From Swiss-Prot:
The gene is SAS5. This is Something about silencing protein 5. Present with 1800 molecules/cell in log phase SD medium. It comes from Saccharomyces cerevisiae (strain ATCC 204508 / S288c). Its main location: nucleus. The lineage of its organism: Eukaryota, Fungi, Dikarya, Ascomycota, Saccharomycotina. Component of the SAS complex, at least composed of SAS2, SAS4 and SAS5. These three proteins constitute the core of the complex, and are sufficient to acetylate histones. Residues 1-139 form the YEATS domain.
Length: 248
């Protein structure tokens, strides 16, 4: 099963020369320019990128405030300057579901232009799924976070057995969780200065199945090496598709 859906983001740029300037010699004229990040829905219509929680524009270092962090929609900036440059636009998915970057060129060849960028958006996060379903026909079932939590808790009675295992087995279970790529990605994308919490029902299904199978290993018949080998599966399994930008 595919782990992502392709979504197109559009960066729209407009610029104009500021009138009545006293330009001397080879001086370049000052311009006002603005830039906005949008998303295209399934029909190609421009919509606000509500699947993003924040956006950071990394402008040229000559600007007084080159790093522009926008924590809410619209992801729009307005500036004045005379030079063209390449900038990075850092985008963060809602629900700590990852991030991606766009490399965009600010040019003055046209008064207005738009550039599209295609991004693979991961689907293993319920909050992100719910928002995506407003714009796309998803190839998987979408449930609310509350429904997902209720369904998975009801289907995982074996979780109670975690309270009964010994310290060595608990250490192995924790290591399996920390070695999982999806968990590692969630940790990496979480703000470093904030505490990180993850409920067991938020873990990927394949990881939960491995933990369940691991807990069924009879303690008296399974050696430490067997448990170690079982837990290492999380390290060698195929990496999930990650969000990334495909520049056109």
């Amino acid at each position: 099963m595919d782990h992502s859906i392709e979504v197109t983001f559009r960066v729209k740029t407009q610029q104009v020369i500021i009138p009545e300037q006293n330009i001397r010699g080879n001086e370049l004229p000052l311009r006002r320019w603005q830039m906005e990040l949008l998303m295209l829905d399934a029909t190609g219509k421009e919509v606000e990128p509500t699947i993003l929680s924040k956006c950071i524009y990394h402008l040229h270092s000559s600007f007084k405030q080159p790093k522009r962090r926008l924590n809410s929609l619209p992801f729009f900036i307005k500036e004045t300057g005379w030079g063209e440059f390449n900038l990075k636009i850092e985008c963060f998915f809602i629900g700590n579901a990852g991030k991606f970057s766009i490399e965009h060129d600010l040019t003055f060849e046209d008064d207005a232009y738009a550039v599209d960028y295609t991004v693979d958006v991961p689907h293993e996060f319920s909050h992100l799924n719910s928002e995506l379903s407003k714009y796309f026909d998803l190839p998987w079932k979408v449930v609310s976070p509350e429904e997902e939590m209720s369904l998975r808790i009801a289907d995982l009675p074996w979780i109670k057995s975690l309270a009964l295992i010994d310290e060595d087995m608990m250490t192995d279970v924790v290591q399996m969780i920390l070695n999982d790529p999806a968990v590692q990605r969630a940790i990496e994308n979480h703000p470093r200065r904030e505490q990180f919490f993850m409920f067991i029902t938020q873990l990927p299904d394949d990881l939960l199945m491995k933990i369940q199978a691991f807990l069924k290993l009879p303690n008296k018949n399974s050696t430490k090496q067997e448990r170690t080998n079982f837990g290492s599966d999380a390290i060698h399994k195929d990496e999930p598709v990650k969000a990334h930008n495909k520049l056109k």
